[in-house]
Amino acid sequence: MAIVYLSLGSNLGDRHSLLSAALEMLQTRVGRLLTLSRFYETEPWGFESPHPFLNAVVALRSELKPQDILHITQAIERELGRTQKSNGGVYHDRPIDIDILLHSVYPKVQSPELELPHPQMWQRDFVRMPLSDVAPWLHPEAPTPNL
């Protein structure tokens, strides 16, 4: 069994309801909820928008491999109204965004569609703040996070 850390964000629609729906779907499809951060309201990162984000980080216990989790999170995003992914560093408003941050069984993943640990998680306050709620022992200077 692995511990998986996921970042969730929403800046369109009923943000609370969308994050809650995503959390329910993740618990049904990915694994058992271990802990959930509080929700943080943050400014958009990497683009300008009048719509602030609501962000959280969740830790789940899962038997799934990172690639399987990625496909599930992408399906959840589509089901909750996301129509396009960020591409080439071009970001936009979205009803839901789910990113895999860390996976305890597969701490290092490098593929065209997924990199673990998430390469930008320590540069983004909207990830760092909620991640510190659920895993305060993690530190950006650690070579491989101790999950």
Curated annotation (Swiss-Prot):
Record carries keyword Transferase: yes
Pfam families xrefs? HPPK
- GO molecular function terms noted in the UniProt entry: 2-amino-4-hydroxy-6-hydroxymethyldihydropteridine diphosphokinase activity; ATP binding; kinase activity
**Its encoding gene is what?**
folK
Catalysed reaction, written as an equation? 6-hydroxymethyl-7,8-dihydropterin + ATP = (7,8-dihydropterin-6-yl)methyl diphosphate + AMP + H(+)
InterPro entries for this protein? Hppk, Hppk_sf
Taxonomic source organism = Porphyromonas gingivalis (strain ATCC BAA-308 / W83)
Identification of the protein by name: 2-amino-4-hydroxy-6-hydroxymethyldihydropteridine pyrophosphokinase
Q: Residue span of the signal peptide, if any?
A: none
The UniProt entry's GO biological process terms, in alphabetical order, are: folic acid biosynthetic process; tetrahydrofolate biosynthetic process
What keyword terms does UniProt attach to this protein? Answer: ATP-binding, Folate biosynthesis, Kinase, Nucleotide-binding, Transferase
Q: Which family does it belong to?
A: Belongs to the HPPK family.
Q: What is its EC number?
A: 2.7.6.3
Function summary: Catalyzes the transfer of pyrophosphate from adenosine triphosphate (ATP) to 6-hydroxymethyl-7,8-dihydropterin, an enzymatic step in folate biosynthesis pathway.
Annotated metabolic or biological route of this protein: Cofactor biosynthesis; tetrahydrofolate biosynthesis; 2-amino-4-hydroxy-6-hydroxymethyl-7,8-dihydropteridine diphosphate from 7,8-dihydroneopterin triphosphate: step 4/4
Does the keyword Protein biosynthesis belong to this entry? no
